[in-house]
Amino acid sequence: MKQYDLIVIGGGPAGLAAAIAAHKNGVSNLLILERDQELGGILNQCIHNGFGLHTFQEELTGPEYASRFIDEALALEIPYKLSTMVLDISTDASTGLHCVTAMNRTDGLLQLPCRSVILAMGCRERPRGALNIPGFRPAGIYTAGTAQRLVNMEGFLPGKEVVILGSGDIGLIMARRMTLEGAKVKAVAELMPYSGGLQRNIVQCLEDFDIPLLLSHTVIDIQGKDRVTGITLAQVGPDRKPIPGTEQNIPCDTLLLSCGLIPENELSTKLGVSLSPVTGGPLVNESLETNVPGVFACGNVLHVHDLVDYVSEEAGRAGKFAAEYIRQTAGDRAGTASAEQNLTTQADSGASSASAGQGSTPLLRTVPSASRLFHRAASDTRFRSPFGCPIWRTRFWFVSASEAYSQTQY
């Protein structure tokens, strides 16, 4: 089985940007694994505009934004596998290599060894089961992302009378999309006293189409046996519990859920990656590396981003850091082999010297691949107070290890 230097899990905006950056930094032996039938990830179903303002300084749709990175990846001849589901990631403690287990219809079960892995699986929507909404389980309840895919890619309209729970960006955009497709969006309800989406989406998707936004409201009941026939909304207090007497019934045949996104953590958990209780994604250092050496994370699997431009920027950094890690580990292995050979030679020479009565043999402290090691030094500690309170900041610079460590121990 071929051994790769880098495997990128996910062919969405984060995975593509990371793979391109790694390739530009000298990693040509890499592979992208994507579970969907085409590259691009979630952007393929986001046919609205508003993408690329920061990255390309122009307004693009989701597929247009994705095609920019797909075309660049194809031009660089970066290999990829589509319709490939990654099942597991393991690490060999003796060699430090990772093994990615994946499966597809063409190749069957794959065991792919590699030196580094970039996690770019994205995020998923919070389902109904995590919301604890009472009532029956009839047809007509979808997450906003599922409805978006049905409308924009599959050509199906989920319903004609719609209520949306949650005011995340996907929910706001789907309120407009369903209206343009001929459905009647009766209300967008939000549990919090403020909207979870961007202000521009509130204006363009709700106010421009006279769709009411009900803040501090939630769904407390779902009616219907075979199909949704209506829902019951109620106002909530500061404790986020329904206030008795504020219930209102809204007839509808579809309920869309836009109640937040959570990072895809299954593979991270299997690998032993530490997760953040705040973001729900992996804990990483300043190099976007997890607690598992050689495993990096970027994009929405790390934390949910508001703009895809920020995803691409972060993923580019992850690709550069992964490339540096691969070069460093390659140098370390070469240095270790050289050090072992030197020690063997010195041991032989020491034995000869001892027999000749010439004293002890010096022990050399070897720093493998000194040009690839860096020592971080802190200096010029200052603080700023942009919000009225001091925020301590420390500047760092990197010193070449060959300059910082040049010593011999006898």
Where are these regions (language model features)?
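Rossmann-like nucleotide/phosphate-binding core characteristic of flavoprotein oxidoreductases
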Residues: 1-5, 60, 82, 276, ...
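Predominantly flavin-linked oxidoreductase catalytic cores and closely associated redox partners
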Residues: 109-213, 218-227, 301-306
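A conserved FAD-binding loop/helix module that cradles the flavin
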Residues: 298-329
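Beta1-alpha1 glycine-rich phosphate/pyrophosphate-binding loop at the start
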Residues: 4-68, 72, 149-152, 159-202, ...
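A Rossmann-like FAD-binding core segment of flavoenzymes
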Residues: 73-102, 179-266, 356, 377, ...
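FAD-binding core/adjacent interface of flavoenzyme oxidoreductases
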Residues: 1-9, 67-161, 235-245, 256, ...
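FAD-site-proximal beta/loop scaffold in flavoenzymes
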Residues: 119, 141-151, 254-305, 339
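Hydrophobic alpha-helical scaffolding
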Residues: 56-59, 63, 137, 192, ...
